[in-house]
Amino acid sequence: MSTKYVEVGELKEGSYVVIDGEPCRVVEIEKSKTGKHGSAKARIVAIGVFDGGKRTLSLPVDAQIEVPIIEKFTAQVLSISGNVIQLMDMRDYKTIEVPIDYVEEEAKGRLAPGVEVEVWQILNRYKITRVK
C-alpha cells in the first residue's frame, strides 16, 4: 500500500485520506479549540473514492493521518465485457481489469474500445476518472 502520514491540521478540503482502509476525498473539515487547556480538534467529513460512502472522523489537529499516494496514468480501453473494462497501461503495456462501478459517471457514456482514458491507482485499486 502506497501511503504517507501527515498531520490532520495540514489537511484541506479536496485532499485525500484513508479512513477505515478506504481512500476518501475530504469534502468538509472543521477545526475547533475545545477550551482553555484542551487541544484543538478537527472534524473531517469525507466521501469514499470507490464506494461513495460518507465517513466522519474526529481527531486532534496534531495527530497523524494516513494519506494515499495517487498515481495517475493514461491507458487505452481494449474491451468492455459485462461489468469489466479491460485496459492497457500505456507506460508498460500491461493489461488491467477495472469494474464498471469504478468509472466516473461522466466518463461511462464515452467509453469504447480504442479510447484513451486517465486512470488513478489508489491503494492497489484502479479508477477511470475521465476520457481523454
Curated annotation (Swiss-Prot):
NCBIfam families: eIF_5A, PRK03999.1. Belongs to the eIF-5A family. One of its GO terms (cellular component) is cytoplasm. The modification Hypusine is found at residue 36. GO terms for biological process: positive regulation of translational elongation; positive regulation of translational termination. PANTHER family: TRANSLATION INITIATION FACTOR 5A FAMILY MEMBER. This is Translation initiation factor 5A. Its main location: cytoplasm. It comes from Pyrobaculum islandicum (strain DSM 4184 / JCM 9189 / GEO3). The keyword Cytoplasm applies. It is found in: Cytoplasm. Pfam families: eIF-5a (PF01287), IF5A-like_N (PF21485). The keyword Protein biosynthesis applies. GO terms for molecular function: ribosome binding; RNA binding; translation elongation factor activity; translation initiation factor activity. Signal peptide: none annotated. The gene is eIF5A. PROSITE patterns: IF5A_HYPUSINE (PS00302). Functions by promoting the formation of the first peptide bond. Keywords: Cytoplasm, Hypusine, Initiation factor, Protein biosynthesis.
